[in-house]
Amino acid sequence: MFKDIFKKNKKKKYVTVKNMTDTEVPEGIMAKCPKCQKIMYTKELQENLNVCFNCDHHMAMNAYDRIDALMDKGTFKELDKHVEPVNPLNFPNYEEKIEKDRAKTEIDEAVVTGWGTINGYKTGIAVMDSRFRMGSMGTVVGEKITRAIEYATKQQMPFIIFTASGGARMQEGILSLMQMAKVSVALNRHRETGLLYIAFMTHPTTGGVSASFASVGDINLAEPESLIGFAGRRIIEQTINEKLPDDFQTAEFLLDHGQLDKVVHRKEMKEVLTTILKLHQRGEN
């Protein structure tokens, strides 16, 4: 009898069964739109230029993907690919952060520069990549862009910069801030020879980048809904003690207030730039 009681109260053993409703998705296979939360196949999204199929939101696009989508196949020649940043101020853990971003993005800095053709029209180009230190502008970013502009000036080519940046890189202090002036001087020399500079702002374009070469194009373009501005929204509201419009610092707001020439959908990027380059070439003739 007592044996029977102990048998009944014997602790039951359970087997953990995997919850089959939790679908495992290998990393890199799927992507979620940050605006509407729609989940899409990464490959299909890339084929659509990282534009959401559902809400048309323009997601971040890395530098090489943008170059591949824009430049004629096989024409892009990269400049200064392996110029690498140093730690001039001995900022703590800066080298480790650089190495981490390098491993994650497979690029050496936050900008890719070079030249090639867009529908047959030769042009110099710099494309910032926000995955690397949030696209911040340090000494190497400034140096690479400056060298590319100088090359375009020497070769008598127009120049295009795609900006995507959180501003100057704080780990490099005043050395990063001086890149604002250095790039602007190179652009001014480029302009003095009668050459065209197109600034193409993408999300986000803020801080020192927005206050220098991002906003001084002969033609200023931007992608839809891009955040463009110098100081943050909250800082401005606290300073002026007023609530700002909901669309403040968006590409559309800047267009309405005369600070942009056109807001360009990513799928129209190549067509619009081709038209501008074509008109510029005719003007030279």
Curated annotation (Swiss-Prot):
Keywords: ATP-binding, Cytoplasm, Fatty acid biosynthesis, Fatty acid metabolism, Lipid biosynthesis, Lipid metabolism, Metal-binding, Nucleotide-binding, Transferase, Zinc, Zinc-finger. Acetyl-CoA carboxylase is a heterohexamer composed of biotin carboxyl carrier protein (AccB), biotin carboxylase (AccC) and two subunits each of ACCase subunit alpha (AccA) and ACCase subunit beta (AccD). Its cofactor is Zn(2+). Component of the acetyl coenzyme A carboxylase (ACC) complex. Biotin carboxylase (BC) catalyzes the carboxylation of biotin on its carrier protein (BCCP) and then the CO(2) group is transferred by the transcarboxylase to acetyl-CoA to form malonyl-CoA. Binds 1 zinc ion per subunit. Disulfide bonds: none annotated. Residues 29-285 form the CoA carboxyltransferase N-terminal domain. Pathway: Lipid metabolism; malonyl-CoA biosynthesis; malonyl-CoA from acetyl-CoA: step 1/1. A zinc finger (C4-type) spans 33-55. It is found in: Cytoplasm. The gene is accD. It holds the Pfam family Zn_ribbon_ACC. GO terms for molecular function: acetyl-CoA carboxylase activity; ATP binding; carboxyl- or carbamoyltransferase activity; zinc ion binding. Its EC number is 2.1.3.15. Belongs to the AccD/PCCB family. One of its GO terms (cellular component) is acetyl-CoA carboxylase complex. Zn(2+) binds at residues 33, 36, 52, 55. One of its GO terms (biological process) is fatty acid biosynthetic process. InterPro entries: AcCoA_carboxyl_beta (IPR034733), Acetyl_CoA_COase_Trfase_b_su (IPR000438), ClpP/crotonase-like_dom_sf (IPR029045), COA_CT_N (IPR011762), Znf-ACC (IPR041010). This is Acetyl-coenzyme A carboxylase carboxyl transferase subunit beta. It catalyses: N(6)-carboxybiotinyl-L-lysyl-[protein] + acetyl-CoA = N(6)-biotinyl-L-lysyl-[protein] + malonyl-CoA.
